[in-house]
Amino acid sequence: MIASIFGKITFVGKRKIIVEANCISYWFNVKENHSFEKNLEKPRQVFCQIIKRMVTNQILEEGFAFNTLEEKEWFSKFIELNGIGSKTALNLLNNNLEEMRDYIKNSNYHALTKLTGSNSKVARALLALELYDRDDGGKRIKPNTAMANDYDEMFDTLKSLGYKPQDIQNALSKIEIKPNFDVSEVIAEVIKLMSFQNNEVTNKTA
């Protein structure tokens, strides 16, 4: 697998760059707040990842470039999670990665929903991300799959009661949920919040 290429950056756009290496030009997708600069004289190392996917019986390749090796590692972890594709993974890189690490480490679901490129579904997926704590000698941070499963249970329960997925996601993102929460209590609070919001909409349109 290619980890990086060494070449000249011949084009820089908002979400794409072109890197020329060994007389071949490569298109790469990049995050929106990237720091790549066009330079036709001096080559540089560009960390990258190639993703292959099947589209109408054809294998298509898509390239992604990163400012640092750390960004590449985060991206690789993101796309391994259920419900997070390459576009969402790239958008997540626009956030402060150290803050995101702390949110995941502390199971701060509410903060995760507020990240750029995130929502309730993405936040639940991030809770299951396996990290290593740099402040504790590289000790493994176990993914909080139990909490992620609890969020899935709440979402499925509310959906079975007839609430719209978008309304559920919006309500969950507005509630500050603490560790060791009671699922039934949170469901009741979400229903209360959605009912209040629906009443507000009804009153405005009346």
Curated annotation (Swiss-Prot):
SUPFAM superfamilies: RuvA domain 2-like
Biological process terms in GO annotation: DNA recombination; DNA repair
Region annotated Domain III, chain positions: 146-206
InterPro entries, per the entry: DNA_helicase_Holl-junc_RuvA_I, RuvA, RuvA_2-like, RuvA_C
Entry keyword DNA-binding: yes
GO CC annotations, alphabetized: cytoplasm; Holliday junction helicase complex; Holliday junction resolvase complex
Top-level taxon of the source organism: Bacteria
Compartments reported by the entry: Cytoplasm
Keywords assigned by UniProt, alphabetized: Cytoplasm, DNA damage, DNA recombination, DNA repair, DNA-binding
Pfam family, one: RuvA_C
Presence of the UniProt keyword tRNA processing in the record: no
Main location: cytoplasm
Coiled-coil portions: none
Molecular function as annotated in GO: ATP binding; four-way junction DNA binding; four-way junction helicase activity
Region (Domain II) residue spans: 68-141
Gene3D superfamilies per UniProt: 5' to 3' exonuclease, C-terminal subdomain
Renumbered residue ranges of the record's region Domain I: 1-67
Intrachain disulfide bonds: none
Span list, region Flexible linker: 141-145
Domains as described in the record: Has three domains with a flexible linker between the domains II and III and assumes an 'L' shape. Domain III is highly mobile and contacts RuvB.
General function of this protein: The RuvA-RuvB-RuvC complex processes Holliday junction (HJ) DNA during genetic recombination and DNA repair, while the RuvA-RuvB complex plays an important role in the rescue of blocked DNA replication forks via replication fork reversal (RFR). RuvA specifically binds to HJ cruciform DNA, conferring on it an open structure. The RuvB hexamer acts as an ATP-dependent pump, pulling dsDNA into and through the RuvAB complex. HJ branch migration allows RuvC to scan DNA until it finds its consensus sequence, where it cleaves and resolves the cruciform DNA.
NCBIfam families according to UniProt: ruvA
Subunit-structure text: Homotetramer. Forms an RuvA(8)-RuvB(12)-Holliday junction (HJ) complex. HJ DNA is sandwiched between 2 RuvA tetramers; dsDNA enters through RuvA and exits via RuvB. An RuvB hexamer assembles on each DNA strand where it exits the tetramer. Each RuvB hexamer is contacted by two RuvA subunits (via domain III) on 2 adjacent RuvB subunits; this complex drives branch migration. In the full resolvosome a probable DNA-RuvA(4)-RuvB(12)-RuvC(2) complex forms which resolves the HJ.
Cross-referenced PANTHER family: PROTEIN SMG (PTHR38692:SF1)
Protein name, UniProt field: Holliday junction branch migration complex subunit RuvA
Organism the protein comes from: Mycoplasma pneumoniae (strain ATCC 29342 / M129 / Subtype 1)
